[in-house]
Curated annotation (Swiss-Prot):
The keyword Ion transport does not apply. It comes from Acinetobacter baumannii (strain AYE). This is DNA replication and repair protein RecF. One of its GO terms (biological process) is SOS response. Its main location: cytoplasm. NCBIfam families: recf. The gene is recF. ATP binds at residues 30-37.
Length: 360
């Protein structure tokens, strides 16, 4: 879904923003604090229901306002989101109210590339698991269904473990069965997708870090040789003592291994940033291969990447048919990259929350 129109109301210092005639690449420049990143934040809110900067709606809803609204239009779809300060939200697709955020997310596959962040590598399994599940959601049709049932059973089982101390196997049996059934499905789906993803990943890794050898290794979160049900039965008493479920796909990890150890231990900060970009580009490539185009948010491109890496990233995103919304302090170098690569783009100047077209 490529956006042709974007309206933003009451997101941080953006009181009213109306953008038309959006291009494959849309570049927002201005001083720090002008509101550039808030534009990306608003698009992220529309696609995912949350900000990438804070989990608290009142922190991004304009001061003394009750809500924030983001609306976008493509050649075929209209989608909108109203977020209340309470956290409640109203979502619409083509004028009809929809019940789940997933319905918007399916229409608007979105990747946020932040060249300053190394969280995916340095901050434990959760962000890597989320990265994998983003891909699963968009390329494996049955994943969301299985994940919903698994998550529901996990929540119920953990509630029992937290509230009751003398639980028998019979008490947990219904949840064990549901966790086992859907957990095995999730494991099988993830294993297949990681194998496919690794092919795309190696291609993008070779372009950004040609001297590095890195493999994606999926760790399922339970002992696959005996199965999840056996782990749940074996860990029954320990789970009661811990008050949570230790084994299952919710504990999975995507390990990034080099011949010299794990990526978080052996790579430099600069290498980690390029590795994360390669991971996300390869996911975008996998969607592109199934005729799904991704909207990409690219924050502060020129701050962390050298000129060669900047040009390679822009060129690759263009090859993959992505629509890009990027922020920069140095729009001159970005303009040069786009001109050199003959990419259609639009410049926007941002000043104190006001966004205006700028000369290309």
């Amino acid at each position: 879904m490529h956006l042709t129109r974007l309206n933003i109301e009451r997101v941080r210092n953006l009181k009213t923003v109306a953008l038309h005639g959006l291009q494959p690449f849309n570049v927002f420049y201005g001083a720090n604090g002008s509101g550039k990143t808030s534009i990306l934040e608003a698009i992220h809110l529309l696609a995912t229901g949350r900000s990438f900067r804070t989990h608290i709606p009142k922190n991004y809803i304009q001061y003394e306002a009750d809500d924030a609204i983001v609306f976008a239009q493509s050649a075929t779809e209209k989608i909108g989101m109203q977020k209340l300060a309470s956290g409640e939200q109203l979502m619409k697709v083509n004028g009809d109210t929809v019940a789940t955020q997933g319905q918007l997310a399916k229409l608007l596959p979105l990747q946020h590339i932040d060249p300053q962040s190394t969280d995916i590598i340095d901050h434990g399994a959760k962000p890597r698991r989320q990265l994998l599940d983003w891909l699963m959601f968009h390329v494996e049709p049955e994943f969301y269904f299985a994940w919903q049932y698994y998550s529901r059973a996990l929540k119920q089982r953990n509630t029992l473990l937290k509230t009751r101390r003398n639980l028998s196997l019979a008490d947990l049996e219904p949840w064990n069965k549901m966790l086992s059934d859907y957990g095995e499905i999730l494991h099988s789906q993830r294993l297949s997708i990681v194998e496919q993803w690794n092919v795309y990943f190696q291609n993008d890794l070779s372009q950004l870090l040609p001297d590095l050898e890195i493999e994606l290794e999926y760790s399922p979160g339970f002992h696959t040789e005996q199965g999840l049900m056996q782990d749940l039965l074996n860990q029954h008493q320990k789970d009661i003592e811990r008050r949570y479920t230790e084994y299952g796909p919710h504990r999975a990890d995507l390990r990034l291994k080099t011949p010299f150890g794990h990526a978080d231990d052996v790579l430099s900060r600069g290498q980690k940033k390029l590795l994360i970009i390669a991971l996300k580009l390869s996911q975008i490539a996998m969607l592109h291969a199934s005729n799904k185009e991704t909207v990409v948010l690219l924050d502060d491109l020129t701050a962390e990447l050298d000129l060669t890496a900047q040009q390679r990233l822009i060129e690759r995103l263009s090859q993959l048919g992505s629509q890009v919304f990027m922020t920069t302090l140095d729009h001159a170098s970005v303009k040069k990259h786009l001109h050199d690569l003959s990419i259609s783009y639009q410049l926007f100047s941002v000043e104190s929350g006001q966004v205006s077209l700028a000369a290309p």
